[in-house]
Regions:
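Active-site cores enriched in adjacent His and Asp/Glu residues with nearby glycine-rich loops
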Residues: 1-35
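Charged, cofactor-coupling segments
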Residues: 34-106
Length: 106
């Protein structure tokens, strides 16, 4: 996360080297976690150290929020744990701005 924010020019290497470990600088642009369980509730709670079992669904949701420009985006994938490879339940959902705009104009 930090490397990408540096690449985008939102953070610089010197700032990152001097940052507090208790309050990492990336939190300004990414204030939430990267995942949660999905089940009976949208944000199901579970032990984060629990072993994944077939049938569980969890999210992978990176995001970026640039308050100074009043923009933000978070893309969520919902992942089903199976006996074999995990299945991305949201694999066929539009992700690119053009795809979303096209869908909205139908």
């Amino acid at each position: 996360m930090e490397a990408e924010l540096i690449r985008l020019g939102l953070l610089n290497t010197d700032e990152v080297k001097k940052q507090s470990q208790d309050q990492p600088l990336y939190k300004k642009y990414f204030p939430h976690g990267t995942s949660h369980y999905l089940g009976l509730d949208v944000h199901d709670y579970g032990d984060k150290y629990r072993k994944f079992e077939p049938g569980m669904v969890l999210t992978c949701e990176p995001g970026i929020y640039i308050r100074d420009e009043a923009i933000g985006v978070r893309i969520e994938n919902d992942i089903l744990v199976t006996e074999g490879r995990p299945v991305d339940l949201t694999a066929n959902i539009p992700r690119e701005a053009e795809e979303i705009e096209e869908l909205m104009n139908k």
